[in-house]
Design a protein with these regions (language model features):
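Transmembrane helical elements of multi-pass membrane transporters/channels
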Residues: 23-42, 150, 184, 217-221, ...
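Generic alpha-helical transmembrane segments of integral inner-membrane proteins
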Residues: 29, 33, 37, 41, ...
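Helix-terminus/linker motif at the lipid-water interface of multi-pass membrane proteins
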Residues: 33, 37-55, 124-138, 194-205, ...
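Small-residue hotspots at the loop-to-helix junctions and early N-terminal turns
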Residues: 51-62, 144, 148, 211, ...
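Short runs within selected transmembrane alpha-helices of multi-pass transporters and secretion channels
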Residues: 75, 79, 150-169, 177-188, ...
Length: 464
């Protein structure tokens, strides 16, 4: 067999393989594409109100981001077993993992509400550095507080929705969560326009209207997903007896906690690390906060493909591992990683070429638009490397190597990325764009680590 044929056999699948992969991934990609598109429109509408409003909302969204990742970690702790339970035909085990998700997400929501109600103002202030002396940071703080109080009302429906939606996806049914998301983001977009600007009989509420629109949309999405799941019990066998009791067998709970707690802590610590990096950037002034907000919103539109392709790796590989088909798991993983990176290179190239047009949509200063354009270009250059490390992370997670993923993700962030950001932002005279590039470039170290870990096959484990 020629060298090219060996490479093709190892890293490229046939039509049936990609059809199966894309049937799972495309609904998730579309769901997140619509969500991020509406987030982009929401960001633009808030941006029309002014730099202070946009910055206040952006900072609060950084805090909510940590909560979102905590919820993701809570459901992921059980999902590493859920996919394998389903692949093994163990519906009762799948039900216990669902219960764990409900308990964990509601606990995280309660703790988050308590923290942000008592310390929200202090946390927002950490991101506000007045380098000009015009009082803009005080105005941004007030807008941030207005936005935060209302956003807290949407935490519980988000938590419940994630518990249900992730279990539904583990069964391979990605269409319903996608449709629910479409309805929710449509609701969000319409209400954003009506409530932010006061169209027709609706009051002009500004940032308060943006928060209300988001909260209402979250309730809509949760109701649709929960209603469908209970109306279609035959497709969601894990719901059989889910509410007849509240217990989880000690042995299963212990297993989930041992494997899952590192994953939960990983998501929280990684998200906290990323917000800390943003805080380091923010010491360079409110313009940097605004520019980063624009760039991050645009980047989120383009990184959807590699993020969702990576997430699908844990589902497909997890099902193979649960069924004991270890060689198929390794083969599928190789092909999915290559496909994910290939798709990301295309998206990154498009983002690099057209990303600079987006900042002009915002109602802000030329300086902020210029910063945003440069941040977008840097993000596009680094994105393919992020794709590989992201796929590596989900590969390791599919085999239950949560302690390894903990070291790979959050420990790396706090030991490498955060110190680099802090030292460059506080201790050098480098421009903020140079600082941003050097911090983002630390992803190359992570790529090397991820490659070695995946190649070692430590993740090829049947856990159920």
């Amino acid at each position: 067999m020629s060298y090219w044929k060996k490479i093709k056999k190892k890293y490229m699948g046939d039509r049936a393989f990609y059809r199966h992969y894309l049937l799972l991934a495309v609904p998730m990609i579309l769901q997140n594409a619509i969500t991020n598109l509406v987030s982009f429109l929401d960001n633009i509408m808030v941006g029309q109100l002014g730099t202070e409003q946009m910055s206040g909302v952006a900072i609060v969204n950084q805090l909510i981001f940590v909560y979102n990742l905590a919820i993701f970690g809570a459901v992921s702790a059980a999902s590493i077993f859920g996919a394998q339970y389903f692949g093994n035909g163990d519906h009762r085990g799948h039900m216990h993992s669902f219960r764990f998700k409900l308990y964990a997400t509601l606990l995280v929501s309660g703790l988050t509400m308590l923290l942000l109600l008592t310390k929200g103002s202090d946390l927002i202030s950490l991101y506000l550095t007045d380098t000009v002396g015009n009082g803009a940071t005080d105005v941004a703080l007030q807008y941030g507080k207005q936005y935060l109080v209302i956003m807290l009302v949407g935490l519980v429906p988000f938590a419940v929705n994630q518990a249900y939606a992730t279990n539904i996806k583990e069964t391979g049914q990605t269409l319903v969560p996608m449709l629910a998301s479409f309805v929710a983001v449509g609701t969000n977009a319409v209400l954003d326009y009506l409530l932010i600007f006061g169209v027709g009989p609706f009051p002009e509420l500004g940032v308060t209207g943006a928060a209300l629109a988001t909260v209402i949309a979250r309730y809509v999405e949760a109701v649709i997903v929960v209603f469908w799941a209970h109306r279609n019990r035959e497709k969601n066998r894990y719901l059989e007896g889910a509410y007849r009791g509240f217990g989880i067998p000690v042995s299963e709970l212990k297993t989930i906690l041992i494997k899952g707690l590192p994953l939960m802590f990983n998501e929280v610590l990684w998200a906290a690390g990323m917000t800390t990096v943003t805080q380091c950037y923010s010491v360079r002034g409110l313009d940097v906060v605004a520019g980063l907000n624009i760039a991050t919103t645009i980047t989120n539109l383009f990184n959807i493909v590699y993020i969702q392709l990576g997430a699908c790796i844990s589902i497909v590989v997890g099902q193979y591992l649960g069924a004991g088909e270890l060689e198929k798991a390794k083969d599928a993983d190789n092909k999915m990683i290559v496909f994910s990176v290939f798709c990301c290179v295309i998206m990154a190239a498009i983002m690099f070429l057209v990303g600079g047009f987006f900042p002009d949509i915002y109602n802000t200063t030329a300086e902020i638009k210029d910063l945003a354009t440069k941040f977008i270009a840097v993000s596009a250059l680094i994105m393919p490397f992020c794709s590989f490390s992201h796929a590596s992370y989900f590969t390791l997670r599919s085999g239950g190597k949560t302690m390894v993923t903990f070291l790979f993700d959050s420990v790396f962030t706090w030991v490498v990325v955060v110190p680099v950001a802090f030292l460059l932002a506080h201790g050098t005279g480098l421009g903020i764009v140079s600082v941003y590039f050097l911090v983002q470039a630390t992803e190359l170290i992570k790529v090397v680590i991820g490659y070695c870990m995946v190649r070692s096959n430590v993740w090829v484990v049947k856990m159920v």
